[in-house]
UniProtKB/Swiss-Prot annotation:
A Pfam family reported for this protein in Swiss-Prot or TrEMBL: RNA_pol_L_2
Annotated source species: Archaeoglobus fulgidus (strain ATCC 49558 / DSM 4304 / JCM 9628 / NBRC 100126 / VC-16)
Annotated EC: 2.7.7.6
Upper taxonomic lineage: Archaea, Methanobacteriati, Methanobacteriota, Archaeoglobi, Archaeoglobales
GO cellular component, one term: cytoplasm
Catalytic activity of the protein: RNA(n) + a ribonucleoside 5'-triphosphate = RNA(n+1) + diphosphate
Protein name (record): DNA-directed RNA polymerase subunit Rpo11
Gene3D superfamilies: RNA polymerase, RBP11-like subunit
Biological-process GO terms, alphabetical: DNA-templated transcription
GO molecular function, one term: DNA binding
The encoding gene: rpo11
InterPro entries: RBP11-like (IPR036603), RBP11-like_dimer (IPR009025), RNA_pol_Rpb11_13-16kDa_CS (IPR008193), Rpo11-like (IPR022905)
Main location: cytoplasm
Length: 86
């Protein structure tokens, strides 16, 4: 996975996440939307074969990259919980 920052401000970020598809981006969006500091989290994959997946996050003033980190920590915790139950 390669992450590239396309645009960033105090309360928003637009990222390209190469090598990923709907599986990861939908999960990331899900956990971002659950964050009370996140106003908008949406992603787009322009074309499934050649498009680079993009995600846009807007927050209520907190660092948007911190929101992405928190969402990824929740994904890791959910995966660890699942692995413990197997």
């Amino acid at each position: 996975m390669e992450v590239k920052i396309i645009d960033i401000g105090e309360d928003y970020v637009r990222l390209v996440i190469k090598g990923e598809g709907h599986t990861y981006l939908n999960l990331l969006q899900h956990y971002l939307v659950e964050d009370e500091d996140v106003i908008v989290a949406r992603y787009n994959i322009p074309h499934p074969l050649i498009g680079e997946p993009e995600i846009y996050i807007k927050t209520s003033g907190v660092d948007p990259l911190e929101a992405v980190k928190r969402a990824n920590e929740k994904i890791i915790a959910a995966c660890n919980t699942l692995l413990e139950q197997l």
